[in-house]
């Protein structure tokens, strides 16, 4: 798209800010809170339209608020306090997100992913599974799922995991059986494999806290609004029954609902064997990487009472550098990690300001009036369903989470009977699972959709079917299991 045709992307956020700012301040809100909300909404619009990278949008929003903090961030009472220096306070607020433990946890997880890539361990694991399970098409589907499952805990970019590691491997498989893209032969085996690729990415994105950046953004938003949080182990245990069910069910379900013509063959295992021979035996760097990953996972699951999850990640990254699994240049040159680091920290800062100015509490009280008379369970389920279905309107999981999660959290806070940890975990699971609904919902979606093996009608049909199944199972496990382990 030419720059001359993109002007509206730049003007739209500014127009939204101006329109909201000109609306009379609602009853119960102070003027600075309403103006803050106007800028916050403009940032969300900017994240959706992306006239510039999302991190830049968020940083610009923070800069505007910090510079104009006497009118946007602080109340007249705060400004009148003796010794109150808005310049120092606004700077402290602007950089507060970078001290959040969630930021450092996801940054460490990105470095784990770099270690997987640099050592070749991630590719080796996927090839081993394909070799062992690739004789039958159904088992090949499970191999794709298990590959995603193993990589997901330490690969917080589902795009890097799905599009960068898994897709380059499985795209080589269909041609081995003369299953070609954009051809009648695509249904032979290619369509099933590609659908398994994207659906496995969505499922595993919901299973682990560190499997997808928006999961950690949600926890940051939750913490800034309520001071409650979910640990890595909380998320894992809360999702455990649903995780087991989906990992075992989805490959078979795809096999039944989108059956491949070819049921078995030996070409895929032979190809995987050739690739593994070319890689050679497991090297010392891969062994060290494997040991560190296992250690990190054990501490994340069982060590929460002794060491913070972010500190585990930070320490393991230090060991990765010391053991020369990755280099310092790998860290400073990791654009994806630094990009997420800045936009996630900035969005958490903005969400903190939304709470500090009183908007979240005001919005919660507003919702409390409209939700009174309904049971907490009914309200919780209705909110999850609405949140899930609104996924159709967003082409970015980050924008989706940034725009809707604060409102969902405010709604839950409006009814003390709603267990916030359970509700937020259901929201978090919906972010990943709901990504299956459309061919534009998350980073890997367009990659698999554009492979030539998934026709448009098939993608939308399967997305709706699997999306509905995921939603039903999420609600059931959310109501029956999550309260047992989280409350």
Swiss-Prot record:
UniProt gene name: ttdT
Subcellular location: Cell inner membrane
Lineage top rank: taxon: Bacteria
Keywords carried by this UniProt record: Antiport, Cell inner membrane, Cell membrane, Membrane, Transmembrane, Transmembrane helix, Transport
Stated name of the protein: L-tartrate/succinate antiporter
Positions of transmembrane segments: 10-30, 33-53, 54-74, 93-113, 137-157, 189-209, 236-256, 292-312, 313-333, 340-360, 370-390, 393-413, 418-438, 465-485
GO cellular component: plasma membrane
Pfam families registered for this protein in UniProt: Na_sulph_symp
Database matches in InterPro entries: CitT-rel, SLC13A/DASS
Span of the signal peptide: none
Organism: Shigella sonnei (strain Ss046)
Coiled coil: none
NCBIfam families: dass (TIGR00785)
GO molecular function, one term: antiporter activity
Reported function: Catalyzes the uptake of tartrate in exchange for intracellular succinate. Essential for anaerobic L-tartrate fermentation.
Catalysed reactions, semicolon-separated: (2R,3R)-tartrate(out) + succinate(in) = (2R,3R)-tartrate(in) + succinate(out)
Family note: Belongs to the SLC13A/DASS transporter (TC 2.A.47) family. DIT1 subfamily.
């Amino acid at each position: 798209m030419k720059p001359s045709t993109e002007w509206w992307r730049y003007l739209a956020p500014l127009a939204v800010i101006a329109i909201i700012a000109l609306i009379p301040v609602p009853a119960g809100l102070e003027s600075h809170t309403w103006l803050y909300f106007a800028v916050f909404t403009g940032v969300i619009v900017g994240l959706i339209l992306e006239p510039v990278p999302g991190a830049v949008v968020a940083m610009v929003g923070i800069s505007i608020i910090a510079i104009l903090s006497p009118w946007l961030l602080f109340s007249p009472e705060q400004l009148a306090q003796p010794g109150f220096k808005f310049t120092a306070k606004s700077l402290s607020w602007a950089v507060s997100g970078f001290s959040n433990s969630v930021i450092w946890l996801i940054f460490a997880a990105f470095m784990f992913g770099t270690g997987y890539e640099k050592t070749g361990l991630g590719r080796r694991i996927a090839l081993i599974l394909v070799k062992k399970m690739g004789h039958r098409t159904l088992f090949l589907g499970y191999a794709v799922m298990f590959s995603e499952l193993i990589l997901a805990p330490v690969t917080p970019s589902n795009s890097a995991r799905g599009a960068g590691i898994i897709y380059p491997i499985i795209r080589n498989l269909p041609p081995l059986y003369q299953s070609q893209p954009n051809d009648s032969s695509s249904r032979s085996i290619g369509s099933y494999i590609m659908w398994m690729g994207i659906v496995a990415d969505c499922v595993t994105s919901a299973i682990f806290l560190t499997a997808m950046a928006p999961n950690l953004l949600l926890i940051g938003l939750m913490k800034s609004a309520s001071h409650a949080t979910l640990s890595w182990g909380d998320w894992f245990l809360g999702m455990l029954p649903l995780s087991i069910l989906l990992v075992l069910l989805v490959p078979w379900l795809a096999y039944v609902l989108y059956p491949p013509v070819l049921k078995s063959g030996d070409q895929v295992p032979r190809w995987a064997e050739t690739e593994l021979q070319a890689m050679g035996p497991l090297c010392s760097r891969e062994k060290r990487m494997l040991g560190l990953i296992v250690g990190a996972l054990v501490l994340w699951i069982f060590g929460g009472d002794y060491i913070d999850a972010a500190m585990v990640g930070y320490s393991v990254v230090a060991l990765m550098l010391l053991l020369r699994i990755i280099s310092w240049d790998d860290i400073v040159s990791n654009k994806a990690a630094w990009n997420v680091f800045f936009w996630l920290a900035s969005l958490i800062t903005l969400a903190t300001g939304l709470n500090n100015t009183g908007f979240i509490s005001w919005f919660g009280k507003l919702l409390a009036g409209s939700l009174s008379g309904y049971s907490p369970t009914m309200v919780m389920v209705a909110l999850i369903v609405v949140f899930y279905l609104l996924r159709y309107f967003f082409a970015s999981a980050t924008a989706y989470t940034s725009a809707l999660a604060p409102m969902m959290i405010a709604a839950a806070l409006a009814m003390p009977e709603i267990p916030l940890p359970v509700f937020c975990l259901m929201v978090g699971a919906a972010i990943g699972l709901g990504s299956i609904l459309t061919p534009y919902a998350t980073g890997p979606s367009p990659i698999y959709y554009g492979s030539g093996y998934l026709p448009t009608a098939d993608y939308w049909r399967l997305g709706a079917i699997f999306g509905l199944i995921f939603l039903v199972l999420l609600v059931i496990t959310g109501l029956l299991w999550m309260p047992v382990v989280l409350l």
